[in-house]
Amino acid sequence: MFGLKQFYQDEVRAKLAQELDIKNPMLLPKLEKIVISVGAGAHAKDMKIMQNIAQTISLIAGQKAVITKAKKSVAGFKIREGMAVGAKVTLRNKRMYNFLEKLIVISLPRVKDFRGISRNGFDGRGNYTFGINEQLIFPEVVYDDIMVSHGMNITMVTSTDNDKEAFKLLELLGLPFAKVR
């Protein structure tokens, strides 16, 4: 693989400085972290399934997943405080760029009828979140090893507080956004 971090340092930073008209290189937007999270939903009661979900995310990310717990009890959802409700992984630096490259080059092209990811996932503060419906698009996941099919949320946190700059950064890094109609 070419190395997305090297690509960012060599080419993307120069294009960003030119297109966004930023003179100070320290003010250029950069990717700070990627958070991969899964909510277990109805499967939260079964600890074996929770462990399987955490193991699957660990395989995908290349880093150990943390099982998230409920902060407070919600009777309507039959959730108690401290009960396992999902799993997440926070990726930074080398693992973050490796995951992003794998996502762009290998995983997203494996999505059936893929036409690009939505441009509507920006939160107004320069962060971008999108969802994946199935974990089987990742090459590390073996179909026979999963107990339940689940999707995941992927959040990309950037150093900028501007959605326009964050979009330009992610677009130059190669994220395949859907065409505007």
From Swiss-Prot:
Record flagged with keyword Coiled coil: no
Pfam families, sorted: Ribosomal_L5, Ribosomal_L5_C
Top-level division of the source organism's lineage: Bacteria
Gene Ontology MF: a single term: structural constituent of ribosome
GO terms classed as biological process: translation
Keywords: Ribonucleoprotein, Ribosomal protein, RNA-binding, rRNA-binding, tRNA-binding
SUPFAM superfamilies with a match to the protein in the record: RL5-like (SSF55282)
GO cellular component: ribonucleoprotein complex; ribosome
Residues spanning the membrane: none
Functional description taken from the UniProt entry: This is one of the proteins that bind and probably mediate the attachment of the 5S RNA into the large ribosomal subunit, where it forms part of the central protuberance. In the 70S ribosome it contacts protein S13 of the 30S subunit (bridge B1b), connecting the 2 subunits; this bridge is implicated in subunit movement. Contacts the P site tRNA; the 5S rRNA and some of its associated proteins might help stabilize positioning of ribosome-bound tRNAs.
NCBIfam families for this protein: PRK00010.1 (NF000585)
Subunit organization: Part of the 50S ribosomal subunit; part of the 5S rRNA/L5/L18/L25 subcomplex. Contacts the 5S rRNA and the P site tRNA. Forms a bridge to the 30S subunit in the 70S ribosome.
Family: Belongs to the universal ribosomal protein uL5 family.
Name this polypeptide is given: Large ribosomal subunit protein uL5
Native organism: Helicobacter pylori (strain G27)
